[in-house]
Amino acid sequence: MKILISNDDGYLAPGLIALADAMAAIADIVVVAPDSNRSGSSNSLTLDRPLSVYQAANGFYFINGTPSDCVHIALTGIMSEPPDLIVSGINQGQNMGDDTLYSGTVAAATEGFLFGIPAIAFSQVNKGWGQIDAAARVARDIVERRFDTYGKPFLLNVNIPNLPYEQMKSPVATRLGKRHQSEAVIKAQDPHGRDIYWIGPCGGQKDAGEGTDFHATALGHVSITPLQIDLTHTAQLEALKKVLV
């Protein structure tokens, strides 16, 4: 098996290194990641300038672009054959509910899915790398599960509690929860007295009921959510057709 690995925290991130080590124990790996932290870059591609590919001493490729750039270039310019699986992460911090729309970690997996390749995004709840080895062990457990009877290609979003491996509960299938709207921007001034703005913190949990990713991880379970790309609001199609008559 060959696995392509990427992330949005950058090629030096402990989460990427731990994930690569875990995957290297069970497969041939290729790592292509951003040269720096690209959190919140979503599915953006860099179209206004050329991109450069570099290789670190450990064999990881890194690119001065977004997570989607990295996977796109890996599949169309670096790898001679497509991988069997793409994994992204392990992100420092959860990607649950509305987070998935902004997440570069999820976007890297999504880019592979758009190429018809099964993909899994891995994130660890809360900040800090103290339990990253446990999270990497969970990631390996999930990749080693047999998905032969599962529809391919698939796109999975996995959130792992920030706990020792022995304290984690079994993986559960979940749906995305929902957050309240983001908090207000933080306004300040630069040294020249000009107004500057920092994007405010994400909103708190709005829908964290049973069956959601928020609920599962709060109870210590590993949350696995199947994602799709089709943004069509199917339930409103017929109503829209009537408006347009």
UniProtKB/Swiss-Prot annotation:
E.C. numbers: 3.1.3.5
UniProt-annotated binding residues for a divalent metal cation: 8-9, 39, 91
Class of this enzyme: hydrolase
Subcellular locations according to the entry: Cytoplasm
Keywords carried by this UniProt record: Cytoplasm, Hydrolase, Metal-binding, Nucleotide-binding
Necessary cofactors: a divalent metal cation
GO molecular function per UniProt: 3'-nucleotidase activity; 5'-nucleotidase activity; exopolyphosphatase activity; metal ion binding; nucleotide binding
One cellular-component annotation, GO: cytoplasm
UniProt remark on cofactor binding: Binds 1 divalent metal cation per subunit.
Record field: catalytic activity: a ribonucleoside 5'-phosphate + H2O = a ribonucleoside + phosphate
Family recorded in the similarity comment: Belongs to the SurE nucleotidase family.
NCBIfam families per record: PRK00346.1-3, PRK00346.1-4, surE
Function: Nucleotidase that shows phosphatase activity on nucleoside 5'-monophosphates.
Protein name stated in the entry: 5'-nucleotidase SurE
Underlying gene: surE
